[in-house]
Amino acid sequence: MSDNNKKSIAVLGAGPAGLMAAWRLRCAGFAVTLFEQEPVVGGMCATQTFKGRDGEYRFDYGGHRFITKNPELLAFIDELMGDELLHAERKSVIRFGGRTYDYPLNLPNLLKTAPLALMAGAVKDLLLLPFAKKPTDFAKASFAEWIQSHFGRTLYRQFFEGYTGKLWGINPDKLSADWAGQRISLIDLKDVARRLLPRRNGSISVRTYARKYRYPKYGFGQIFTTLGERLVAEGVELKTGATITRLEQADGRIERVYWKQDDVEQSAAFDQVISTLPLPLTCQHLGLPCDLHYRSLRFVNMPLKTENLSDNTWQYLSDPHILATRLQEPRRRSPFMAPQGQTSVMLEIPCNPGDATWQAPLSDLRGRVTADLASLGVDTAKLGDETFEARSEYAYPLMDLGYQARRNEAIKALMPITNLIMTGRQGTFRYIFTDTAMEMGMMAADMVIDGVDRRHAILNHRNENTVIETQSVA
């Protein structure tokens, strides 16, 4: 412990991975400085609180929930949060073409809701799928090819094509398929058929999303603010509002970390640097090239003067003419996300920095999404006139065709820096779940603690081609 105390560790970014790395390191006796650009910890998993006329409204940066198949991690979060960690159940629907479909799909709802042509096309696809040409290398396949080879063209056109294009901002035939196996719950059309057919005992054996999950009383970010408070109490130096500006390297090591806080640039030397910053930013701070990009989000959040909008946690909005991709009601996760007797809505709007949507005045966006909400059947007269917004510049790593080679080039350029560890969703440029990011943070800390190089293991952690949510113990 005394030797560890002499080693100083910089953790860049206080999201799930950075916080867990700092916790593990501090428990092992290391001196840890944790840097966070925002005023609060949590990164993309933070919760924002807005004070409206009728009370406080809380909004996450998207649809977060705590699920994991790691009993050790679950026990840690249970102990950390105690009675503040609630049990919740997810209910989701797909809105498309003026119809509302259950998600995941089920036969009674499809028979009641889907046009006859859709049902006929899906059955035809199922019969022809065994004879259809499939991509020979799914690592190089496009998302469009992957979906059609597993679901058939009819379901692809109905449920995936428009939504995916709107979310990622590129045509699905230009998007890589290598992440789909962990994110799409119906693995192939045979699974669809097994799901659609009713079971005698009512059970379903095919893979699907976890419906039950844990969620903090006051928003997902409460997990990370609570952990941040514990870290500070244990002696971690937490610097919020601190933007990393440069990483100085010499002889294969980062010698100094430079940051700006309160408009003053400062620097310090560290023995080891764990970076959860977006991978392109880490490269930029070291003067290295990196041709990787992100898809951004704007969130338009509005109070609603009614106790409940619906019983849906979120609604996928697949119609291309609707600006947002998801409509969420935070109160469905915890009743404490809105004042008593009221609720709120959150719309996720994909965009790119500098484009028309990113630059649009909030009043313009509100007008557009209000019209969209009305078309979805929401009583917009109950919205009032308050609007709260948030932005996430690095919401989704853009996994277009060929991104793997560009990611490998960036990682190869960083690997000679022996005291740098990239970890977490942003630091590894991976589209992963929160618990995986937390595990990556612990792995980075373990590398510092025992000196075993785990960088390649971290970069590929939980990269198996299976739906990760299906194995949740939370």
Where are these regions (language model features)?
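A short alpha-helix-loop-beta-strand transition element characteristic
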Residues: 47, 58, 73-95, 154-158, ...
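Active-site/ligand-binding neighborhood in enzyme catalytic cores
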Residues: 115, 124-247, 269
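N-terminal Rossmann-like FAD-binding beta1-loop-alpha1 element of flavoenzymes
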Residues: 7-34
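Mid-domain catalytic core of redox enzymes
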Residues: 28, 240-381, 408-411, 459-466, ...
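Dinucleotide-binding Rossmann-like beta1-alpha1 core, especially the glycine-rich loop
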Residues: 53-135
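C-terminal lid/capping helical subdomain adjacent to the catalytic/cofactor pocket in oxidative enzymes
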Residues: 401-474
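Extreme N-terminal leader/targeting segments of oxidoreductases
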Residues: 1-9, 27-28, 470-474
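Glycine-rich FAD pyrophosphate-binding loop
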Residues: 26-51
